[in-house]
Amino acid sequence: MKLRRAGRLIHLAYQIRRAASAARFHFCYGYSVYLTYLDESGSPGDLNTPFFVLAGVAAFERQTHWLEQELDAIAEPFEQRAGKYLELHAAPMKASKEGWEIFSAAERAQASADVLRVLINTRPRLNVFASVVEQSQMARTADILPHCYEVVASKFDDFLALKYQREKDPQRGLFVLDQKRATEEKAMQSLHKTFKHVGHANGRLRNFAEVPMFADSKSTRLIQLADSIAYWIFRHYSKLDEWGWPQIQPFFASLGNGRTGLHQVLDPATPARLATAQPPAFPFPPAIPKAAQPAAPVQPAVQHPIRTAPGALIIP
């Protein structure tokens, strides 16, 4: 199980570095990459989900390793008991599905809270971007996903431009999305090229390294974090569920002039309805103090197999 996941991680890392290399964004040029992991909640055209959310989290490329480790540490005790790899997807964790059915409601709530708490505990700060659409307010169902992608991409592009304007910090961006449908992947990449080279409603994308990358959510915990963010934003708008929203709201990216990383298309009556939301029946659980870890035993040096023939000339 771990070997298969390691293989997926290696492939994802290769894709990301290949994109950065193709765009010539090496450190020697003074550039580095911000990765925004995105996922969605709700289904365009589904009357049972009146809202659609595309949301995710932006992290500096050198943060992703540590974020993966922190999220792995949340899942590990549950995986040991389940005997298999568990994804940190918010909906199955809440509904007790996809391997989470053997755990109590309190345990699942603690795991869900710990996932969102990654936003609070990470330094430098993580930035959240989201587009929320009330489906009744869009003229065509087919426009919902492209509209959400356009506004999130535009906001992320503005975020990178603002970093340069304020801090003289040249950064480039890359989207990593959950690989769900091949047709959606092709459509998104084509749409991104149009926004970059032709333009969108507010201009052109200027700070992206490449077209978006798509990865199986099993290969990276960061897409699972994006899933949790999208899910709890969706719950806030559709169910007036205030359990996860207060943890996410402070982390919407600041874009200057009062603008944030949150974009909303709502029925005029919806803000008043949201204002009536009540505190959750089951409060957000506090963090569990980490037990002191014993010193790790010294591991013997690994003897790597010799791959060259005896007497081969090796020129490093």
Residue ranges and their predicted role:
Residues 2-316:
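Phosphate-ester processing/binding pockets and catalytic centers
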